[in-house]
Amino acid sequence: MVDLIDHFDIQGRIEYDENAPVKHDLLKTEWFNAVLVCLEAGQEIPPHPEPYAVLFIVLDGEGTITVGIERYDVTPTHVIFAPQGSVRGIAPRTRMSILGIQQPH
């Protein structure tokens, strides 16, 4: 994680682990946090509540993002918003990378 970024290629940060999802904290500021989550097909992050809002931006792959009772089938360039306090989860059908822009916490 860095406090200040001028520029970097996010593709260079994408990595996968067959044993568990990979999460990289890219940036943490007083206004937002940026995280990169990389999952192999079948590595689900089960729906769970979180106290902060997040904007998911799908970079690569296909899967389903759950927010509350809604399920969204997503592919690259899809954007999903999960409000503060909502239940959210990720279920990739293929290898998948997602950029999350989070409310600071």
Where are these regions (language model features)?
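A short, N-terminal "cap"/entry segment at the start of jelly-roll beta-barrel domains
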Residues: 1-31, 66
